[in-house]
Amino acid sequence: MKTTHKRALAAFLVLTVPVFAGTVQAWGDIGHRIVAELAWRQLDPSAKAEVERLLKADGSDSLADVASWPDHLRNDPDQKELGKATAKLHYMDFVDGKCVYVKPVDCKDDECVVGGLEKYVAILGDRHKSNAERAEALKFVVHFVGDVHQPLHAGNRDDKGGNDYQVQFDGKGSNLHKVWDSSMLYTRDLPWPAYTDRLAAEGPVALPKPIPPLDNPYAQWAEESCSIVAANGFYPDNHKVDDAYVAKYLPVAETRLRLAGKRLADLLNHTLD
């Protein structure tokens, strides 16, 4: 992707789509599918046609079907090395704990979800790349947009994105990351297509205002996630995720899913135009 196009993309996303260590998943399969399907429904015809073409070249059926693909690479003997090489691109840790993105410390050598998005959006938008390269980039972009909107994939604590924070949920032992990945979403007792319909029926999501002085939309999305994690009450003091916690934070999780879907659609519309 040319430098001028990268700058234009950054400006576009900032104006129209404001912006844990270890091998962990974000949202789980249900959340990633919801984000992908919400985005699919908001694609322009030209972008949708290009997505379909790339998916067909990849042998895939739908955007939702490939949304969790990066999480399964390390379990695939043929893709294990790619999974290992991209493992750090699923998340980031705010080192100073203040949720202020400082690239040299928060994304050293571009090995964080912000760097992952920058890398694969550039490949996706490069028409000189092969269909295989661009299809692979598409799958990473879909997944990483979902990842960066899961609050615990851009946290400010040294607890492996909540994996080390043990909680009781529904009478069973768990951890806070798993609760946010999927456990809270499952309390709706809806399959992902019906869940997507429910969220889509809420209408257009209100986009947060840009956070100055950032000119990197992906970093802004990470800062938003971090601010949720840093708020009082996000980590339950008694290590118990009760009905009151779910009532408070399930709408927050659903808003993040809706934002991710909208932003992914706008990103693909712009990149594939």
Feature locations, PLM:
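Bacterial N-terminal signal peptides that target proteins for export
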Residues: 2-12
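Low-complexity, Gly/Pro
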Residues: 2-3, 18-26
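Bacterial N-terminal signal peptides
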Residues: 10-20
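N-terminal, motif-rich segments that launch catalysis or mediate targeting to/interaction with membranes
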Residues: 25-144, 151-273
